[in-house]
Amino acid sequence: MKVHKEGTGLLLTLFTILFIVNITLYHTVGKGMLFYSVAFVSTVLFLLVLNFFRSPFRRFPYDSEGLVIAPADGTIVAIEEVMENEILHKKCLQISIFMSIFNVHANWFPVNGTVKHVSHQNGRFMAAYLPKSSTENERSAVVITTRNGVDVLARQIAGAMARRIVTYAKPGEKCHVDEQMGFIKFGSRVDVYLPVGTEVLIEMDQKVTGNQTPIARLSK
């Protein structure tokens, strides 16, 4: 499995620091319980961070036309009608996916279309599974207009541990399912806002896989 480009710098830095710490400890105290304990913790820490930045190759295996595909790995924590007052300014169906630190944290475009809007807003860093995180945490918004003229809003939300949201989408560019929309580092959430009345294909607490699980079907 590949390492995501967002993690290469951090992993190299972490490896260098851990290597120096362990070599210094070895030459200072030699082999012993302290050295082996630190070496074990260092290995586990590096493997955990490496696992977080894994970048699996994924292709949606079916015709994606009219479908909304999960933009992230995680658990469905919200399926509800809400007023979206920041970007779309209308009532929408919100589907929210919470990503734990053990999930892949790459984000994919949920639909095919043209990027209409991209924005970033600073905010708090409360736990991403809380409903208020959608409007109070640091977040980035991407609006995609489908071929049929439907606006779909995908919002990347930072969590309690996530301090950096990366968004690759650019206004005016064509986007497709199978392409990465961005990346969120360390525990986070993605909300998708759809027209009211959209057919929902998932249920609460369901585990979904980014760019693999259909979560809704847009009306024709």
From Swiss-Prot:
Taxonomic superkingdom: Bacteria
Q: Name one GO cellular component term.
A: plasma membrane
GO MF annotation terms: phosphatidylserine decarboxylase activity
Q: Where along the sequence does the record put site: Cleavage (non-hydrolytic)?
A: 187-188
Enzyme Commission number(s) from the entry: 4.1.1.65
Q: Which UniProt keywords apply?
A: Cell membrane, Decarboxylase, Lipid biosynthesis, Lipid metabolism, Lyase, Membrane, Phospholipid biosynthesis, Phospholipid metabolism, Pyruvate, Zymogen
User: Which InterPro entries does its entry note?
Assistant: PS_Dcarbxylase, PSD-A
Modification after translation (UniProt)? Is synthesized initially as an inactive proenzyme. Formation of the active enzyme involves a self-maturation process in which the active site pyruvoyl group is generated from an internal serine residue via an autocatalytic post-translational modification. Two non-identical subunits are generated from the proenzyme in this reaction, and the pyruvate is formed at the N-terminus of the alpha chain, which is derived from the carboxyl end of the proenzyme.
User: How are cofactors bound according to the entry's free-text note?
Assistant: Binds 1 pyruvoyl group covalently per subunit.
What PANTHER family does UniProt report for this protein, alphabetically? ARCHAETIDYLSERINE DECARBOXYLASE PROENZYME-RELATED
Quote the protein name from its UniProt record.
Phosphatidylserine decarboxylase proenzyme
The primary gene name is psd
